[in-house]
Amino acid sequence: MFVDQVKIDVKAGKGGDGAVAFRREKFVPLGGPAGGDGGRGGSVILVVDEGLRTLMDFRYRHHFKANSGGNGQNKQMYGRGAEDTFVQVPPGTTVRDADTNELLGDLTEDGQELVIAKGGRGGRGNMHFATAKNSAPEIAENGEPGQERSIQLELKVLADVGLVGFPSVGKSTLLSVVTSAKPKIASYQFTTLVPNLGMVQLDDGRDFVLADLPGLIEGASDGVGLGIQFLRHVERTRVVLHLIEMDDQTGRDPYEDYQQINHELESYDPKILERPQVIVATKMDLPGSAELLAEFKQKLAAAGDTHEIFEISSITHQGVQPLMNKTADLLAETAEFPMGDVEEAQTQKLYQYQPEGPAFNVEQDEDGTFYITGEKVERLFKMSNLDHQDGVMRFARQLRSMGLDEALREKGAHDGDLVAIDNFTFEFVE
């Protein structure tokens, strides 16, 4: 098992702006405000698709954006709400905020959904701001900005296919040819000390996880060499590719190697041999390999062994593609292992109280301008429609009620000093 990780950027849609409008109809002299509300912005939602096995698709697309809501209209008509954007992920995906590492959710069940970027609410139209003192307000809210963040997706991946065989039969070389994995490769035994995994993606869209597992030796089922540690990984694979090298320079008998590996597998767990196993004759580009293979087939037939044999050369790529296609076919016919079979360390969640930050911060620049920052005040600014005088006055009252005037005075602001919020600058008035 290994953890696949990918980082994506998501942005929810902005809410639609509320409208400033008035009824202008015949025989309705006191029409009043009639500006409708903006529509809700679309959210970005992760949804579990049990047909997915990996995070491969996110290697090619990193940005996901939802549409904004429609603006409000005259005659109290609401703007259209935007549709949500759904992003499919495989079961077992853990979702974290990439900046804070906060755990946002664990997605395990097919169809389970998680909102990772919430769409902004629509701004209110001027029909909401009529009062006894102001029956024709030119006040409307802009739509709330949609949530924008970076997300870290993590998937604990079990290998679908395991490469087994004696050390240096070509497992690491084959893995490097069919995936983007870069295992350590050399012509001596026990090059691979830990499992290397890679994603195989076929032209027809099928994909699976292939594991290059440490080489077996006699007595592995009793713990010799890498022993039990290796066999535990084989136990979790659904298809076994048994690699036998056809190299007459090693002085080894391919059939004896084949029998010995299967004996170790059976000694550890007889059920392993019940899984689909394909014999892969490697290094078929070497002189004398054809003769060795013919002898191997004769011994196999004499023993009544009917396992299918694929001849490959990882150097020339001979026979590699048919082998991968056959492997994908076998996986389609073989049941998956439940995620619960994997032993997980028990972890205790610790929840800490996070006090809400200040509504705003005031800092004075070298040029004397006072800059106002803070999530709450910036959100208020973005939702304020400052195209009309009524909207400007309402925004000023809201800032005053938040205590901004007093905070500016404490920082030394005087009448006429410049104050900036985001890209909006105004003069401080005592």
Curated annotation (Swiss-Prot):
The keyword Membrane does not apply. SUPFAM superfamilies: Obg GTP-binding protein C-terminal domain, Obg GTP-binding protein N-terminal domain, P-loop containing nucleoside triphosphate hydrolases. One of its GO terms (cellular component) is cytoplasm. It is an enzyme of class 3 (hydrolase). GTP binds at residues 165-172, 190-194, 212-215, 282-285, 313-315. PROSITE patterns: G_OBG, GTP1_OBG, OBG, OCT. One of its GO terms (molecular function) is GTPase activity. Residues 159-332 form the OBG-type G domain. PANTHER family: DEVELOPMENTALLY REGULATED GTP-BINDING PROTEIN-RELATED (PTHR11702), MITOCHONDRIAL RIBOSOME-ASSOCIATED GTPASE 2 (PTHR11702:SF31). HAMAP family: GTPase_Obg. This is GTPase Obg. It comes from Latilactobacillus sakei subsp. sakei (strain 23K). The gene is obg.
